[in-house]
UniProtKB/Swiss-Prot annotation:
HAMAP family: Enolase. It is found in: Cytoplasm; Nucleus; Cytoplasm, Cytoskeleton; Cell surface. Substrate binds at H166, E175, E304, D331, S383, H384, R385, S386, K407. The modification Phosphotyrosine is found at Y139. The modification N6-acetyllysine is found at K133, K375. Homodimer. Forms a complex at least composed of DegP, ENO and HSP70. Interacts with G-actin. Interacts (via the DKSLVK motif) with mammalian host PLG/plasminogen (present in the mosquito blood meal); the interaction occurs at the ookinete cell surface and is required for ookinete invasion of the mosquito midgut. Interacts with A.gambiae EBP; depending on the Plasmodium species, the interaction is either involved in ookinete invasion of the mosquito midgut (P.berghei) or is dispensable (P.falciparum). One of its GO terms (cellular component) is cytoskeleton. It is a peripheral membrane protein. This is Enolase. GO terms for biological process: activation of immune response; autophagosome assembly; DNA-templated transcription; glycolytic process. It catalyses: (2R)-2-phosphoglycerate = phosphoenolpyruvate + H2O. There is a cross-link at K138 (Glycyl lysine isopeptide (Lys-Gly) (interchain with G-Cter in ubiquitin)).
Length: 446
């Protein structure tokens, strides 16, 4: 029996930062299937377009009524009557025909908005899973051509100290994460992470005062830390105090594009201070040396966006220097875009993809980006955005694609824990048919 789309309705809802975002209800004979899209704060310039209204009289210009109108008036009429199991056909219709906008990196979604297209793409996935009478993660695995007899549960990369554009402190690097690779299961990994998180809170309170334990957009703490060493020392202390030395490692998201000066090709590690300390302005080569020193001193297993999104040369230098032992992840560099991934492969610029579905704007293209990366023996980390919703789609996606790693914030704030809690449910439902990635989070688990 064909399960056709009978109705599509989009609405404007609020994300975790209080900004508007797009939610879609898609109806078939099996019921209503809902999806909501996230949005980022530190966005890469090569991301597909997130359509905002720019009407300063509503939500300070951040409204998404244009995207809503595009769904209700342009996309919905074309999709009604189509079979919800035709994911690729529907995504291609939206991206290539109804939108059709392109730039040098592929389909840019600048006409209808990636936020409009993605919301429908996700809702279609949920409807397709119901039509096939399988869970969303099993259906996504089928779409990706992955085996679904034994699924992989990811290591959670929990963002517990915030800096960069996500925080009001002086810390230039954006995220410091704890990675419980030594746990025997996802459930235990989450427990390790939560215990380290609470231990860290006590350490911060002791050292910086009670008001230093306020949390940022992703649930991490943002004490008035001045540099990366100070943050890493705090993490090492918290991990040790919680009893998980050797079992919990560290990952960083530098988000270096946020403090890169393209005119003189330097990185300002004091970019949040009006009269910055000139000794903290570094060349790319000096930054390479800084990362090498940090990796020698601390149990760092992954570094994301260590350089600007166009600094291919220094990416390649760092990957050549430490890529065997440390995952070098491209986020702003790659923006989940198969064309950018291909360029990075040619230049040996990094060895892992950060997979953000809203950077590329459709589930079909996100799967393509993942498969291209895995085919070339890269790691893949599925990721949230700093402006999130209660939608848990990425929890199912990470299990389906067998990537072995996910970052979706600290074990704090409901829009973050919603994803972790969904992974707990998935692990429970799979029972013996689940394997936890653990120490092998970088390896091919396909």
């Amino acid at each position: 029996m064909a399960h056709v789309i009978t109705r599509i309705n989009a609405r404007e809802i609020l994300d975790s930062r209080g900004n508007p975002t797009v939610e879609v209800d898609l109806e078939t004979n099996l019921g209503i299937f809902r999806a909501a899209v996230p949005s980022g704060a530190s966005t890469g310039i090569y991301e597909a377009l997130e359509l905002r209204d720019n009407d300063k009289s509503r939500y300070l210009g951040k409204g998404v009524q244009k995207a809503i109108k595009n769904i209700n008036e342009i996309i919905a009429p074309k999709l009604i009557g189509m079979n919800c199991t035709e994911q690729k056909k529907i995504d291609n219709l939206m991206v290539e025909e109804l939108d059709g906008s392109k730039n040098e990196w592929g389909w840019s979604k600048s006409k209808l908005g990636a936020n409009a297209i993605l919301a429908i793409s996700m809702a279609v996935c949920r409807a397709g899973a119901a039509a096939n009478k399988v869970s969303l993660y099993k259906y996504l695995a089928q779409l990706a051509g992955k085996k679904s007899d034994q699924m992989v549960l990811p290591v959670p990369c929990l963002n517990v100290i915030n800096g960069g554009s996500h925080a009001g402190n002086k810390l230039s690097f954006q995220e410091f994460m704890i990675v419980p690779v030594g746990a025997p299961s996802f459930k235990e990994a989450l427990r390790y992470g939560a215990e380290v998180y609470h231990t860290l809170k006590s350490e911060i309170k002791k050292k910086y005062g009670i008001d230093a334990t306020n949390v940022g957009d992703e649930g991490g703490f943002a004490p008035n830390i001045l540099n990366a060493n100070e943050a890493l020392d705090l993490l090492v202390t918290a991990i040790k105090s919680a009893g998980y030395e050797g079992k919990v490692k560290i990952a960083m998201d530098v988000a270096a594009s946020e403090f890169y000066n393209s005119e003189n090709k330097t990185y300002d590690l004091d970019f949040k201070t009006p009269n910055n300390d000139k000794s903290l302005v570094k060349t790319g080569a000096q930054l390479v040396d800084l990362y090498i020193d940090l990796v020698k001193k601390y149990p760092i297993v992954s570094i994301e966006d260590p350089f600007d999104q166009d600094d291919w040369e220094n990416y390649a230098k760092l990957t050549a220097a430490i890529g065997k032992d440390v995952q070098i992840v491209g986020d702003d560099l790659l923006v989940t875009n198969p064309t950018r991934i291909t360029k990075a492969l040619e230049k040996n610029a990094c060895n892992a993809l950060l997979l953000k579905v809203n950077q590329i704007g459709s589930i079909t293209e996100a799967i393509e980006a993942c498969l291209l990366s895995q085919k070339n023996n890269w790691g893949v980390m599925v990721s949230h955005r700093s402006g999130e919703t209660e939608d848990v789609f990425i929890a199912d996606l990470v299990v389906a694609l067998r990537t072995g790693q996910i970052k979706t914030g600290a074990p704090c704030r409901s829009e973050r824990n919603a994803k972790y809690n969904q992974l707990l449910r998935i692990e429970e439902s799979l029972g013996n048919n689940a394997v936890f990635a653990g120490e092998k989070f970088r390896l091919q688990l396909n």
